[in-house]
Amino acid sequence: MSASIIAIDAMGGDFGPHCIVPACISALAEFPSLHLALVGQAPLIEEQLARQSGVDRSRLQVHHASEVIAMDERPAQALRGKPDASMRVALELVRQRQAHACVSAGNTGALMALSRYVLKTLPGIDRPAMVSPIPTERGHCYLLDLGANVDCSAEHLYQFAIMGAVAAETLGVARPRVALLNVGTEDIKGNQQVKLAASLLLQARGLNFIGYIEGDGVYRGEADVVVCDGFVGNILLKASEGLAKMITGRVETLFNEGLFAQAVGALAMPLLRRLKADLAPARHNGASFLGLQGIVVKSHGAAGQESFQSAIRCALREVQENLPQRLHGRLEDLLL
């Protein structure tokens, strides 16, 4: 494969083809070398394609899959009971090297289970971890895990830290600062798993481990890679998104209270738009599953067109950076 081909689970998420197909058409327009394989119920996909103008069908394929994994479906049921689900067929395209990556807005637990089953993990990795950039005062940091692994051992946190550091390096961060999210920065703080993980990371050669970080330190940009279990990470991510929406919403409301406030708001509108763009979850949508023998990107289930397009951008960048192969090479040095 010379061109970058991304398999899209067109049935995933809250909106399915109605949102995903237009996002794919926009992505094709944005990246002239991109090819997409839309996987799902072909009649529904074709119906949405017919509503789009300027579709380049030479860079777009439709793969029919008769089954859909529901957002509330148990991972075990998805794994055993739906061999022709759109999510699974999209992952199979990656395994068969007919696509370089898979993007899905579907059921997170099912996507993780199927990804591990179909693509397998890299040597030395027990569990893949979900990672995504989140905005900070200094730009962004990479946070993992974001919900794929609710219960983690110290060894899992250690592996997440190694994978996060290597991914950050691959994506352009020189000697990334790695920290464990904790309730304090002192050595005595934290539960047993976090303390054990810290002791392991202190012994890791070639890793720039800076110790513990608190929640406010994440947003000050005190670390480039922040590691926690999926329970904590998912709560932090969702709270961040909610807080960003509340702040921008409150500012807009204040600028509409009275003539003077409206005048000030009109002058400040360019800055407000910039702030909203910087904090918008759509801009940062796309969580990578690190540790697999292939590229899988999870989009937010409630993602709209712009947001899903961001997830496609994330997958394309990882394809261009050859992330799994580079990750495998560095993990051999650090873990094996």
Curated annotation (Swiss-Prot):
Write one Pfam family the protein is assigned to.
FA_synthesis
> A GO molecular-function term, please?
phosphate:acyl-[acyl carrier protein] acyltransferase activity
A GO biological-process term:
phospholipid biosynthetic process
Which pathway does it serve?
Lipid metabolism; phospholipid metabolism
Instruction: Kindly state which reaction or reactions the protein catalyses.
Output: a fatty acyl-[ACP] + phosphate = an acyl phosphate + holo-[ACP]
User: Which spans are transmembrane here?
Assistant: none
Provide the alphabetized UniProt keywords.
Cytoplasm, Lipid biosynthesis, Lipid metabolism, Phospholipid biosynthesis, Phospholipid metabolism, Transferase
- Which SUPFAM superfamilies does the record match to this protein? Isocitrate/Isopropylmalate dehydrogenase-like
List the residue ranges forming a coiled coil, or say none. Answer: none
Q: Among the entry's GO cellular component annotations, what is one?
A: cytoplasm
| Enzyme Commission number | 2.3.1.274
InterPro entries linked: FA_synthesis, Phospholipid_synth_PlsX-like
Please list the disulfide bridges. Answer: none
- The main enzyme category here is transferase
As for subcellular location, the record says: Cytoplasm
HAMAP family in the cross-refs: PlsX (MF_00019)
Describe its function.
Catalyzes the reversible formation of acyl-phosphate (acyl-PO(4)) from acyl-[acyl-carrier-protein] (acyl-ACP). This enzyme utilizes acyl-ACP as fatty acyl donor, but not acyl-CoA.
Q: Which PANTHER family match?
A: FATTY ACID/PHOSPHOLIPID SYNTHESIS PROTEIN PLSX (PTHR30100), PHOSPHATE ACYLTRANSFERASE (PTHR30100:SF1)
Describe the family membership recorded for this protein in Swiss-Prot or TrEMBL.
Answer: Belongs to the PlsX family.
The record's note on quaternary structure and interaction partners says: Homodimer. Probably interacts with PlsY.
What protein name is recorded for this chain?
A: Phosphate acyltransferase
Q: Which organism is it from?
A: Ectopseudomonas mendocina (strain ymp) (Pseudomonas mendocina)
Recite the lineage of the species. Answer: Bacteria, Pseudomonadati, Pseudomonadota, Gammaproteobacteria, Pseudomonadales
The gene is plsX
